[in-house]
């Protein structure tokens, strides 16, 4: 992870800069007033990764200055959740005098939750053995005895040792309703838990008066699908990454939601299926008849590269488009196409990444009369 100047005194100032930047960027699209969703000023990141430095008997976390590439010691990290900060010193202290746990350890990854669970991945430049497993189990027990709800994973080249499980269970509150999410180590999850809740509430609010079914592309672990299911008859969602699809299936079952169907395919493949260019056996195998769906609304949350032109054209076929973007530059490019047929009726900034230039935006588009 790189340098981050977490300064609560500067929070409103950096947010105002983003508001101005985003408003100016999208002025040509005749957007409505920007809805702004703030982050906690510190302890907002649910994930953090640190390199580990060995100095004689000492062992500590380090980060690198982005400009100078100089390393510096990190004992606390105000951007990370309180849970991560509470665990950081205890973890390193417990490993310092243990040869099996510290030898060739080069990185520690933390994945925490609002629900209180935390997962630690220990990364090594050596193969791990039975002795490591025994020591890691003792470490886990010791820290859980101190009040943590912790799991540990050991990683080395072509090696992954899971002591109990490689995921955490997160609980996000959406308008007073709690949703359960399995979040697997090394797969994508929203990094800012409190802002993730606000994004879900905004999406639910935008689709309140919906009719028919929802189509969702790039659904990840079902983050939005589950919360949006209440506003639609059925939800058909696609995702390419296998671990995310498996988590989405887990989450559908855990939340007892019966109107969401997830298919493992890319947005590009789905576009071909919708246009009848190709038949996909996995649609048949999953009992999915695309013609039976009555989707007036499409929800997209693409990667940083945005949507390709063909997917944009396919998306234009829907009455309403909800688009969550982690890269306003590519959202702008996509809006050049989408605004030919649709107007932006809602416009939001979610401050997922305070004190950085990154912005997360949301738009609702409705077909022009």
UniProtKB/Swiss-Prot annotation:
MF terms (GO), sorted A to Z: rRNA binding; tRNA (uracil(54)-C5)-methyltransferase activity, S-adenosyl methionine-dependent; tRNA binding
Residues noted as binding S-adenosyl-L-methionine in the record, renumbered to the chain: 190, 218, 223, 239, 301
The keyword Methyltransferase is assigned to this record: yes
Listed GO biological process terms: tRNA methylation
GO cellular component, one term: cytosol
Pfam families the record matches: tRNA_U5-meth_tr
Origin: domain of life: Bacteria
Reaction equation(s) it catalyzes: uridine(54) in tRNA + S-adenosyl-L-methionine = 5-methyluridine(54) in tRNA + S-adenosyl-L-homocysteine + H(+); uridine(341) in tmRNA + S-adenosyl-L-methionine = 5-methyluridine(341) in tmRNA + S-adenosyl-L-homocysteine + H(+)
Active site residues according to the UniProt entry: 326 (nucleophile), 360 (proton acceptor)
Keywords, ordered alphabetically: Methyltransferase, S-adenosyl-L-methionine, Transferase, tRNA processing
SUPFAM superfamilies named among the record's database cross-references: S-adenosyl-L-methionine-dependent methyltransferases
Gene3D superfamilies: 2.40.50.1070, Vaccinia Virus protein VP39 (3.40.50.150)
EC number: 2.1.1.-, 2.1.1.35
HAMAP family membership: RNA_methyltr_TrmA
Free-text function comment from the UniProt entry: Dual-specificity methyltransferase that catalyzes the formation of 5-methyluridine at position 54 (m5U54) in all tRNAs, and that of position 341 (m5U341) in tmRNA (transfer-mRNA).
The family this protein is said to belong to: Belongs to the class I-like SAM-binding methyltransferase superfamily. RNA M5U methyltransferase family. TrmA subfamily.
Record protein name field: tRNA/tmRNA (uracil-C(5))-methyltransferase
Gene field: trmA
